[in-house]
Amino acid sequence: MPTISQLVRKGRKTLAAKSTAPALKECPQKRGVCTVVKTTTPKKPNSALRKIARVRLTNGYEVTAYIPGVGHNLQEHSVVLIRGGRVKDLPGVRYHIVRGTLDAAGVADRKQARSKYGAKKPKQK
């Protein structure tokens, strides 16, 4: 424990906050190419087949990203945009793919929360 005079001389070092999405390098989104598209199972107590993609980013990083929404058109060599945001029940998945941009099509027949899934406004009758 430091003395008062030591604190006056040196002060306390502030700990730098650790980034939750280090591969983005302070950018809001990054572009990348899918290397693997597959499904995986979540950890207990959940059960599902979650769609994920391994993405090589333009800065050289390779990350695992979640594909949100029902159905997708992604395959190997698809160009995608990723954003930060982890998936709580998938360990190691810290990024989301942005739907409706580049090669990732928006979710079909989506009526609510459309902007989050890149869905266009449905035609009025």
UniProtKB/Swiss-Prot annotation:
Q: Which GO terms describe its cellular component?
A: small ribosomal subunit
On whether RNA-binding is a keyword of this UniProt record, the answer is yes
GO molecular function list:
rRNA binding; structural constituent of ribosome; tRNA binding
PROSITE patterns, per this entry? RIBOSOMAL_S12
Q: Which GO terms describe its biological process?
A: translation
What UniProt keywords are attached to this protein's entry? Methylation, Ribonucleoprotein, Ribosomal protein, RNA-binding, rRNA-binding, tRNA-binding
Q: Which sequence positions carry the modification called 3-methylthioaspartic acid?
A: D89
Q: Which domain of life is it from?
A: Bacteria
Q: What InterPro entries does the record tag this protein with?
A: NA-bd_OB-fold, Ribosomal_uS12, Ribosomal_uS12_bac
Q: Which family does it belong to?
A: Belongs to the universal ribosomal protein uS12 family.
Q: What does this protein do?
A: With S4 and S5 plays an important role in translational accuracy.
Q: Which HAMAP family match?
A: Ribosomal_uS12_B
Q: Self-association or partners: how does it assemble?
A: Part of the 30S ribosomal subunit. Contacts proteins S8 and S17. May interact with IF1 in the 30S initiation complex.
Q: What is this protein called?
A: Small ribosomal subunit protein uS12
Write down the species. Clostridium acetobutylicum (strain ATCC 824 / DSM 792 / JCM 1419 / IAM 19013 / LMG 5710 / NBRC 13948 / NRRL B-527 / VKM B-1787 / 2291 / W)
